[in-house]
Amino acid sequence: MTQRFSFTRLGQDGAARLGRINTPRGEIRTPAFMPVGTAATVKAMRPESVRETGADILLGNTYHLMLRPTAERIARLGGLHRFMNWDRPILTDSGGFQVMSLTGLRKLTEQGVTFKSHIDGSKHMLSPERSMEIQKLLRSDIVMCFDECPALPAPRERITESMELSMRWAARSREAFGDWPGHALFGIQQGGLEEDLRGKSAEALRAIEFDGYAVGGLAVGEGQEAMFGVLDYAPGMLPEDKPRYLMGVGKPGDLVGAVKRGIDMFDCVLPSRSGRTGQVFTRRGVVNIKNARHADDPRPLDEDCTCPACRSYSRAYLHHVFRAGEILSSMLLTWHNLHYYQELMQGMRDAIGAGDFAGFEARFLAQQAEGDIAPV
């Protein structure tokens, strides 16, 4: 008999939750951060290296994979896990966010979204039913329902229409997903910055019943203060016994603030994208390795970090390979950033378990405020 998807709460400190998601492909410790493998790869990283950073799960992108190499081809080759050599859980987004971002290249109707590929201009259709079909072909462990995500700020009327459409699409996604033992379907709460609309969305999703719930429609231009304002109430509208996922977030401070408010799961391209552009996350804030101040610095990025970049290379060397445009720079800095994010999540898990999340947050903010070490 196939093991079913489940979520166990192991502890709580204020609204911050410690938990474990069980899947047939392994356990996911929560709060969890998912590296983004857009096109079946976390850029500049081998799958084995991603696992070594401490990641229990990664994210794949339905929109990009449906266009290239296509979900049908991946299915013929044994599914996304075998295709990319990742034997741990995978969450796939629905493709909705990317499609909605194609301004001028898409047409939105009740049925779904017709759009032109950014690769070759070919015409495609994404609907709740097609999104579920693609994610099943990929054999995703956690499937996201198809939704619309308008950019903020937006008029209340636009947010209302979008939320109501997303709830109708959520019901169609649930029906198309059916019963797929060992796999999970997450609903996505919408409603922008409007508390009453968030409440109506949560009520509709609870009636449909999902295996987990995402807080969607944030990190789309509203800023951290407004995002935290929504997170002060939105997670509490969702079932306590199911995981809560904040999509597309974020910076280290965003993660700490969101965990404080009851979020269990995150994804973001920031640590990998920043690594490729010389932006490095440390306990003392962001380091710009391209800056000339690092050219003669024999010290590691972070003396307490155990990633390969910090164990074996100096700031001077990392500065050199970045300025020289060497591929090794992207590999090492991405590894460091992902390692830092996973260490941050482990620190939060430990703090929740010890009943010291407030202390953890205070220490985190104090260290970040100190800034980088003085130049040599």
UniProtKB/Swiss-Prot annotation:
Zn(2+) binds at residues 305, 307, 310, 336. GO terms for molecular function: metal ion binding; tRNA-guanosine(34) queuine transglycosylase activity. Keywords: Glycosyltransferase, Metal-binding, Queuosine biosynthesis, Transferase, tRNA processing, Zinc. Residues 248-254 are annotated as: RNA binding. The keyword Metal-binding applies. Binds 1 zinc ion per subunit. Substrate binds at residues 93-97, 147, 190, 217. GO terms for cellular component: cytosol. Disulfide bonds: none annotated. InterPro entries: ArchSynthase1/Queuine_TRR, TGT, TGT-like_sf, tRNA_ribo_trans-like. It catalyses: 7-aminomethyl-7-carbaguanine + guanosine(34) in tRNA = 7-aminomethyl-7-carbaguanosine(34) in tRNA + guanine. Its cofactor is Zn(2+). Its EC number is 2.4.2.29. It holds the Pfam family TGT. The active site is at 93 (proton acceptor), 267 (nucleophile). Pathway: tRNA modification; tRNA-queuosine biosynthesis. GO terms for biological process: queuosine biosynthetic process; tRNA wobble guanine modification; tRNA-guanine transglycosylation. Catalyzes the base-exchange of a guanine (G) residue with the queuine precursor 7-aminomethyl-7-deazaguanine (PreQ1) at position 34 (anticodon wobble position) in tRNAs with GU(N) anticodons (tRNA-Asp, -Asn, -His and -Tyr). Catalysis occurs through a double-displacement mechanism. The nucleophile active site attacks the C1' of nucleotide 34 to detach the guanine base from the RNA, forming a covalent enzyme-RNA intermediate. The proton acceptor active site deprotonates the incoming PreQ1, allowing a nucleophilic attack on the C1' of the ribose to form the product. Belongs to the queuine tRNA-ribosyltransferase family. NCBIfam families: Q_tRNA_tgt (TIGR00430), tgt_general (TIGR00449). Homodimer. Within each dimer, one monomer is responsible for RNA recognition and catalysis, while the other monomer binds to the replacement base PreQ1. This is Queuine tRNA-ribosyltransferase. It comes from Dinoroseobacter shibae (strain DSM 16493 / NCIMB 14021 / DFL 12).
